[in-house]
Swiss-Prot record:
Gene3D superfamilies: 3.40.50.2020. It comes from Deinococcus geothermalis (strain DSM 11300 / CIP 105573 / AG-3a). It catalyses: XMP + diphosphate = xanthine + 5-phospho-alpha-D-ribose 1-diphosphate. It is found in: Cytoplasm. PANTHER family: HYPOXANTHINE/GUANINE PHOSPHORIBOSYLTRANSFERASE, XANTHINE PHOSPHORIBOSYLTRANSFERASE. Keywords: Cytoplasm, Glycosyltransferase, Purine salvage, Transferase. InterPro entries: PRibTrfase_dom (IPR000836), PRTase-like (IPR029057), Pur/Pyrimidine_PRTase (IPR050118), Xanthine_PRibTrfase (IPR010079). This is Xanthine phosphoribosyltransferase. Its EC number is 2.4.2.22. The gene is xpt.
């Protein structure tokens, strides 16, 4: 997605510890037109798989996931990082390691909104080591829903998260791929990668 690639080159910053700062695009400030285009790209890729639900994690995944759900005209469910007292039992729970939070994060989804019969696409902001996506995949498996594919706005290709998630057996679509980032070269980014099937599932 060329508009996203250019925005990362213009606005992205490398922080200590190998962190990529793009909070002017997706994590703090949102650019509506860019976000809408993200959703349209994800929807175009995953529509042939006939999803009936989009799943993400709060907070940064919500904007691109909502844009995708709007384009697909399906509900969006986002995993909560704290279990509210209003969440009905049973709940599906998994744990993820958050680099930005500096530790483990528990994720919760109510069985009221995810279950057997749901055909799910997961949308998130980053694909790095793949831990968060694997946690969401675990929640989907616990619910009895079917995971159709994974979509991420930005992939850190050098962290090899895509390969680590290969055992899930689902297609992965990303919109921008960070090849490397360092003080000498800055952020080296290209259009994202996809391994979507050419024909609808089944």
């Amino acid at each position: 997605m060329q508009a996203l690639v250019e925005a990362i080159r213009e606005r992205g910053m490398i922080l200590p510890g190998g962190m990529l700062k793009v909070d002017g695009l997706i994590n703090h400030q949102l650019l509506p037109q860019l976000t809408r285009e993200m959703g349209e790209r994800f929807a175009a890729g995953f529509a042939p798989l006939n999803p009936n639900k989009v799943v993400t994690i709060e907070v940064s995944g919500i904007a691109p996931a909502l844009a995708t759900a709007l384009a697909l005209n399906v509900p969006l469910v986002y995993a909560r990082k704290k279990k509210p007292i209003t969440m009905q039992e049973p709940t599906f729970t998994a744990q993820s390691i958050s680099r930005t939070k500096g530790g483990a994060v528990d994720l919760f989804v109510s069985s009221e909104y995810l279950g057997s019969g749901d055909r799910v696409v997961v949308i998130d902001d980053f694909l790095a080591s793949g831990g968060t996506l694997r946690a969401l995949a675990g929640i989907i498996a616990l619910s009895g829903a079917e995971l159709l594919g994974l979509g991420c706005v930005i992939e850190k290709g050098f962290e090899e998260g895509r390969a680590k998630l290969a055992d899930l057996g689902v297609p992965i679509l990303t919109l921008a791929n960070i090849l490397r980032m360092n003080e000498q070269e800055g952020i080296v980014v290209e259009a994202g990668l996809q391994d979507l099937p050419k024909q609808p599932a089944g």
